Amino acid sequence: MKKIILFFLPVMVFLSCSSSKKATIHDSGNTLTNKEKNDGWKSLFNGTSTDGWHNYGRQNVGPEWKVEDGVIHLSGSEKGKEGGDLVTNEEFENFDLKLDWKISDKGNSGIIFYVHEDPAKYHETYETGIEMQILDNGTPTRLGQPDGKLYTHRAGDLYDLMASKEVANPLGEWNHIEIKCVNGNLDFYMNGEHTLSTHLWDDNWQKMIAISKFKDMPGFGTFQKGKIALQDHGDDVWFKNIRIKRL
C-alpha cells in the first residue's frame, strides 16, 4: 500500500500544478498583476461594466451586451434589440492585445482591430477594421457554423484573407488569443501557439485584399491606427480578461 501511495503522489502533484497553470492563463479575474501593470499592460474590461466601450456609431451600449459573472456576454436571445459591434473608446496603433473568448453552438463573431469610427462614411466596423475570426468550427461528427466550410473563415483566421493554424479548443471551452501588431508586422496566437504571421499595408497586403470580399471597400485595411471591436453577429459569445499594451 505504501508503494502505491508513493507512486501516485508525484502524479497528483503534477496534475495539481498543471491545473493551476491553466487557471492562471484563463481565470485571472480581469485583473492585472503588478508586473503586468509595470510592463505597461492596461485592462480593457473591469469585470463589472462596459466602461471604456460603446456601440459603433453611438455613445451607449445596447441591451444585447451584458456583463455577467465577470464576463462580457452578447446575448443571442436579445437579437433584434439595440446591439451592434462593441468598440473601445480609445484608438491604438502599435499594440499587443490579449483576451479569452468562448462561442456558442454554431456561433459566429470576431475581434476587429484598426477600426476607423466614422459611421456617416463607414456603416460597419468591418468596412475599415481587420478581423480575427471567432467561430464554432464543428467537428467531423458535429456540424459547426456553416461559414467554417470556407478556407480563411475558421476560428483564428485573418478573416477572408489568410488561414491560420487550427488550435481552437472544443465547443464550450475558453480560447486564449493574442493579436500583436508592430509597424505593420501582424502576428496571431491562440492557446499558446503562434498561428499566423503577415505584414500589413504592403504590396502583398493589397493583393490579398484584391481577391477578397473586401475588394470593393476602399477603406478596408488602410488605417494604421484605430479602435478594437467585438463583433455582434447575432450569436451568443463571451469575452473576458481583455487587456492591451501599447508598443
Q: What is each model feature region?
A:
Residues 1-28:
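Bacterial Sec-dependent N-terminal signal peptides
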Residues 18-247:
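Carbohydrate-interacting regions of secretory-pathway proteins
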